[in-house]
């Protein structure tokens, strides 16, 4: 059985119904210079209860394709943002 992939990221948009956009940051080493560069990947996630707000740190897991762009599901909110 395959291991289920989980990631952590920040919510950058939640204007859709039952969906959100999450920014996943990772560090990649430059091939020539060896410097570590921050790279960001944006993923669309499924948020069934519309729980997350912009700025929240969340955990997501990979799932079956839900729509054309969504194949990740919200697992839990790690850190809530207070405005």
Curated annotation (Swiss-Prot):
GO terms for molecular function: rRNA binding; structural constituent of ribosome. SUPFAM superfamilies: Nucleic acid-binding proteins. It comes from the Bacteria. PROSITE patterns: RIBOSOMAL_S17 (PS00056). Keywords: Ribonucleoprotein, Ribosomal protein, RNA-binding, rRNA-binding. Pfam families: Ribosomal_S17. GO terms for cellular component: cytosolic small ribosomal subunit. One of the primary rRNA binding proteins, it binds specifically to the 5'-end of 16S ribosomal RNA. Part of the 30S ribosomal subunit. Belongs to the universal ribosomal protein uS17 family. This is Small ribosomal subunit protein uS17.
